[in-house]
Amino acid sequence: MNMRRFIILCLLLFASLAAQARSYRAEDIPNVQRADRTRYVSNPDGILSPGAVARIDSVCGALRDRAIAQVAVVAVDDIAGGDVFDFAVDLFTQWGVGRAENDNGLGILLVKDRREIRFVTGGGLEG
């Protein structure tokens, strides 16, 4: 009887851990810029510390104020299928990162479970 309870407990634990891991589609990731123009980091899974988010927001704000670049940073546990770079291009295109007249957008996507970071740059930053 005790072994049966132990096995059931283990199965419940593994099921709850699996349920916590979330794979995002591009349209599911919260765009923090819509709620607060001084925020540039979307960190729905809490991968980055609050201090890191605050520092990145500060640097991104300075880049935007100087009209150097408009930056968006996303850190998630995993994405739903596909290539990370293609996902990043789709995500940051949907969000409209960068000014159209100078194409100065920079999107940075960190996908923890795949151990990948992808940078998507507008043509104005490449030259």
Identify the residue ranges that each predicted region occupies:
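Helix-centric, low-specificity signal for extended rod-like, repetitive segments
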Residues: 1, 13-15, 105
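Bacterial N-terminal signal peptides that target proteins for export
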Residues: 1-7
